[in-house]
Amino acid sequence: MSTAAADPAAAADAAVTRKERRRERKKERRRRARREAAEAARKAAEALAADPEEERRLRELEEAEADASERARRAFEDAERRWLEAAAARAAEKAAAAREESTAPEDSSREYKDDHGNGTEEDDEWEYVEDGPAEIIWEGNEITVKKKMVKVPKKAKENQPIQQDKAHCPFHLKTGACRFGVRCSRVHFYPDKSCTLLMRNMYSGPGLALEQDEGLECTDEEIEQSYEEFYEDVHTEFLKFGELVNFKVCRNGSLHLRGNVYVHYKSLDSALIAYSSMNGRYFAGKQITCEFVAVTRWKVAICGEYMRSRFKTCSRGIACNFIHCFRNPGGDYEWADWDNPPPRYWIRKMAALFGPSDDSIYGKPSDTPHLERSQSSDRRRPRSSDPRYTPSRTRDEDAHKQHSSRDYSHSKHERSSHTEHRRDRKESSASDKHRHREIKDKTSKYSSNMESERESHKYMREEKHRIDHGNGGKGDHGKVRSRKNRSERQESLEPGSSGRSSDFIDQDTTESPSGSKSTGRHHKKTRRQSLEEHSTRRSSRHRDMEDDGRGQSVAVKRKDHHDTSDDRWVATNSDVDSDLETQYQRSSSEGSKLGMKYHARSDSETGYGRSRSGTTKSRRERKRQSGNGERSDTLEVTSDSDTRDMSSDAWRSRSRSSDENLSTHRSRRKRSRSSHDS
């Protein structure tokens, strides 16, 4: 049993022994190979060292390296020497130039004293400046510039105590507030009374965020609307006490400027009244504390970079110690930010509120930079002479559409005269509309009859004339009519003939030309006489009614319209006469009954179309005149002779004659058809 246990242990020891022996053999082989390689390398090195050629080559390499290093050292030394020489030369030149510059003023002053004598006092009061552009002279490759100098008195330097005063705090003098407060090492000046009032931390609306994340809670429109409401309330209240020069609200994030309200009055009395009235009052749940500050120069109080960026930002951010103000609605008091006088429209507006001012505070020129003005800054203000100015944003927007921003106030007498004039025009226009309605009612019963009678009568007259010419001038019994009889019959059928008096018709008949004269000349003479008589009656009526005022002038216009309608009828008659002569020549050249019938039918259709177009034109003219009468300011009821001519009796007689002519025309047409069929 013990022998079996000892056999595995011996076998394990034998296995370990074999591995170790194999590992030892490998190590020995490696050591032998390394020793052999080292021995071979030593022998090769000894062989090379013993070779004379190899020794010579190594010596040559060492000598070449030594020569190269020597050349590099010599080149460096030469360059260093040259640089030192150049530096010494430059230093010598600079020293010489400095000596010349130091001696030049002494030489020039000595020469000037020799030329002008001992005028030291005059030299202190005068200086030499350039007069005009310099003269440039080209001489080959050289350019010579000559400047003309003139002697002028020296300008007095402006005293700037704010920058030169080291005792007083500059920020407190400029803005009336200092971030150090009572801990400031410089003097803070608090005046007993001043034209400028300061209300600290009065505005607490949006736009005063200390952290940038708080600005995300309100949009720019909400901030602008909130400040506009604050401006309307506070500015209106402070404007009650007197004229303002500037009104500013700070939007800085610093505690000493945050929400400060500055009110700069033009007069000291107004500032004192505002102080006594506003100090201790409550606004938005907080008590107002007013104090006087010596801030009168707003150009140095407001941040210039902030103003140039159009109320956007500056490089110092909200922690800037200069004023970052809200932009007033409508761009109010922007001129005061640059210490400039207000525009003329603002002066007129303040004069309307507080009366004209004799103070010359605005007598200095403007130095406002030309900045791009936004559209919203041009807000219009309504005209107002109320001593208690109460602005409203709604009224300003309405006034923006009606009035100019430079035209605000007129006197009370001028406005009252405009009001009375508008009232008179309204009353006259109402009375004139009533009169026009009465005229329209009186004349409406004739319009339909006139239109129908004119159309039917004109068509019948043209048909009658064409039939007469188509039959070669024959009458009812086949007799040939003379030109005189035909012209008389045409006169009896003209629409204007019924409106004439009996003596006028007799005169035309007695003065009618003989058969040898043409019908056109006879009609021209009668038309000329009728036109002269109508113009004489129209001018006489116009002179009688000329002095009756505005309503009478409109009545004359209506009567002239009736006269022009008569003239239009006369022009239509001349057209008919020309058509009759042309058609008579055409029918004579044809010579056949069929041709005459064809031409009569076509001409009748043409005449009917012309009469329809003339009737449509007259209807449009009457409609236009009636529309103009409704839009006119004044209308007067007048008795017109032309209206009396359109009475019912006249139209009844004309319709009776037209019926007789129509029956005659039908009988002739039947006879012509029967003769043609045969």
UniProtKB/Swiss-Prot annotation:
GO terms for MF: DNA binding; pre-mRNA 3'-splice site binding; zinc ion binding
SMART domains: RRM (SM00360), RRM_1 (SM00361), ZnF_C3H1 (SM00356)
Ranges annotated as biased composition (Basic and acidic residues): 35-45, 68-77, 93-119, 367-386, 393-444, 451-492, 529-550
Source taxon at top rank: Eukaryota
Region (Disordered): 1-77, 93-128, 358-678
Record field: compositional bias (Polar residues): 571-591
Cellular component, GO annotation: spliceosomal complex; U2AF complex
Protein name: Zinc finger CCCH domain-containing protein 16
